[in-house]
Amino acid sequence: MQYANCRSCFFAAVKCNPDPYVLRLLAGLGTGFDCASNNEIARVLELGNVDPSRIIFANPCKAVSFIRNAAKSGVNMMTFDNVDELYKVARTHPSAKLVLRILTDDSKSLCRLGLKFGAPLVAVPGLLAKAQELGLSVIGVSFHVGSGSYDSSAFADAIARARAAFDMGKAAGYTFTLLDVGGGFEDATFEANAAVLSEAIDHHFPDRGSIRLIAEPGRFYVSKAFHLAANIIARRAPIAGDACISNEEANAPSVMCTCLIFFLPFFASASHVAPLADFSSH
């Protein structure tokens, strides 16, 4: 977990693997936690040794009940990217420490989270003005370049956008003290990404002073430590003579699945699978 080029505090993404053993291990190492739901917050606090200040509620579109529960649990740091969220927070958790999630270029990632989260820079002044009007505290900026990012330049571009958002914050009367660089880290490219981030931060935030840097790695922590086993509950053979399927494709092993838009699976057979003809037709 120690990298020379990493200058951020880690907040592990609980959604990636909420196994109690993993959470206890990370908590013991002093890691913070990125939670996206009531259940994830409860799992972390149930460990007994994690102060609520070590949690960021990194979900920009929360149910009112979620915000109310965060307030009761002492979780103050949370993200937003829209006006509706500001109204909800003002009603149910006015003492929250808000982090503005901005939209970045995530086109060079396997999972483009910008399809659902992040405020474009053009919307930032209006959001900050509304936050001021409602008397809310905005402490910083967050972004996410997408899960499975495969181009380090995405981080440099995101830092440049964050700098612009910081300047907009100053113009709106805020002094931001937090920069959350999100996740999207891969083990094979972590050092390269950290180097790009470090250089970009030095360039765009030479006056960073007391700005706190945090990151939200998820699969980076656990992808090599776990495998997910699942049963094959049905099989279907290719239709003979299907013009859309070549002979080579028909003979190649394949898997039919769904609900994988936000997952990056690698399939491997764990045991011998009987030929399709061995299955009863009943």
Please describe what each predicted stretch is.
Residues 9-178, 190-191, 200, 204-205, ...:
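Active-site-proximal beta-alpha core segment in soluble small-molecule metabolic enzymes
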Residues 1-5:
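An N-cap/entry alpha-helix motif that binds or orients negatively charged groups
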Residues 8-9, 55, 141, 260-265, ...:
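Short non-domain terminal segments
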